[in-house]
Amino acid sequence: MASFTGSDEDFDAYWDAAGDLGLDAGDGADAGRNALVVPEPRDRHEAFVIPSDICFAARACDPRRLGIDVTGAWAVAANALSYDYLWNEIRVKGGAYGCGFRAAGERQTAFYTYRDPAVDPSIERMERAGEWLGSFEPDEAAFEGFIVSCVSGMDAPVKPYALTKRRNTTYLAGLDPHAREERRTQMLAATPGELRSLGADVTRIAAESPTCVFGGRDVIAKSNAGFNVVDLLG
């Protein structure tokens, strides 16, 4: 398979010069021999020791494994969780340099913190995120801001190369070519009530997602989460 970015004239000139790139070689007997095989993921519950006095933690999963359908409203919920609840609880109260929740398309939901002085307090606050979202009562201006920030990210102009990468990803992932537009429409139509209805699923994600940590030895040792500790420096 090949991907090309350019005008129709450049496209024709490219193939005239490149030939078939060997893409037609073989009779199918070797099909799949050199294919990338991704192993089935499993939770190793690992904490990797690095030279640091802080940590970087993530709790993430593929929501499809939990039977959760991630629509555009999830992006708005991610903004609300990141810039309201998690910011106040983990950044302000907990002292982490940064934190957030992301809903990347339909295939990843993730809590994360970085430059975090402690593991367990942040995990506990992640586990309470769904409860907070379930009682979410924003004022109109704040809620509109969450929506605008989501949609503006989708509407930002991109250069041809970036657009090609986006389309390649859509094709290789087997996504609907119109999924991006549909997701944008769902963002604009999101309501506070719809976000509240996601609270129970956020609680499930926090409870059932694997956790991985990179951090200093002392920070990891203070955690009671029972990590399998891996020393990256031997």
Question: Each predicted region: which residue ranges?
Answer:
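M16 family metallopeptidases and their MPP-like homologs
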Residues: 1-5, 56-77, 85-192, 207-215
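His/Glu-based metal-binding/catalytic segments typifying zinc-dependent metallopeptidases
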Residues: 5-6, 10-91, 231-234
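A general marker of short, structured functional hotspots
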Residues: 10, 41-44, 52, 139, ...
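Short amphipathic alpha-helices in soluble, non-transmembrane regions
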Residues: 14-21, 124-129, 226-227
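A generic structural signal for well-ordered alpha-helical segments enriched in polar/charged residues
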Residues: 20, 128-135, 197, 201
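In a subset of proteins, long, contiguous C-terminal domains/tails are tracked
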Residues: 189-234
